Amino acid sequence: MKAILRSSTRNLITSSRVFKNLRTSEEIRSFLAESTWSISELLQPPTGSSQTEVSPEIVKKMLKLSGLNDLKHDKSVTKALNLQMMLINHLYDNEQDTVTPSRERNDNNGIFRLLASDHLPQQPWDLDDLLKQINELKPDPSKGEVDFTISDLQRDSFVIKKEKNVK
């Protein structure tokens, strides 16, 4: 039984060849030089932007709701959020394909690319930069932040003083 299984497996493996034998380095070079497909065949031209773009107003609103100050580089934040939205839409698009195929599956805007040039690293922060940012922080009453001093936190400020009623 094992011999039959081995011989049939060997026949399956050795009998089906997709490519011809490449014996010389010239044959290998010429084989690899031939282009059999193009990535442009996989991509369709944009059929209209069905995905929502993250606008600078949305970024400012999200920063305010999260309690962060407006950033100077909100274009980079907008770009990063758009990339994240592309990834999320791509993930949900693939999830929905199991139930019903999506119309925008091959839309150029919906393809998430992870390229090093798209995600350039920012300058690292050092201790001096962090201390400078901390010293420049001011409480923002619109966020519910209240300014106080250390004397406001002393133990005496939490003691209830009882006074006698004088008639």
Swiss-Prot record:
Any GO molecular function: ATP binding
Segment annotated as transit peptide: 1-19
GO BP terms in the entry: glutaminyl-tRNAGln biosynthesis via transamidation; mitochondrial translation
Domain of life, source organism: Eukaryota
Pfam families assigned to the protein according to its UniProt record, in alphabetical order: GatF
Reactions mediated catalytically: L-glutamyl-tRNA(Gln) + L-glutamine + ATP + H2O = L-glutaminyl-tRNA(Gln) + L-glutamate + ADP + phosphate + H(+)
Protein location: Mitochondrion inner membrane
EC number: 6.3.5.-
Enzyme class (EC, first level): ligase
Function of the protein: Allows the formation of correctly charged Gln-tRNA(Gln) through the transamidation of misacylated Glu-tRNA(Gln) in the mitochondria. The reaction takes place in the presence of glutamine and ATP through an activated gamma-phospho-Glu-tRNA(Gln). Required for proper protein synthesis within the mitochondrion.
Designated name of the protein: Glutamyl-tRNA(Gln) amidotransferase subunit F, mitochondrial
Organism taxonomic ancestry: Eukaryota, Fungi, Dikarya, Ascomycota, Saccharomycotina
